[in-house]
């Protein structure tokens, strides 16, 4: 019992999401900063953006193209796309740290400690919370991300990105 109580103390809390609130960054602004386009732009909006953290939203619908083959009778969002969406949030966070973010891109160098805890299915709203683990140094940034459906962590990962000036 004591061990479970201690574990609960360290559990990650889900961000509070009110779909009626105006986003901090809408889909159009995301497209200005990230090179991804449909069907690979996986962040619908950003609802919180601070110096060291970001919260993004993905509304998963049954019309997502990946559900045609993953899996037709029991659609599940591929884990690799969850990590990609979280990475896109991380890219937005890092780009927010620099001047003229439209002139830069982020490329991921490393992804570690990925854990999938629950399936993501059509109808789910996924919240991505990404935090910087330290300051951006020499264009390199380390982050930790959590993905939530409701108040449950569905996946998590640590990753490192590099900021590169666009040509």
Model regions and ranges:
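Hydrophobic beta-strand-centered segment that forms part of the acyl-chain substrate-binding groove
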Residues: 15-24, 90-129, 154, 161
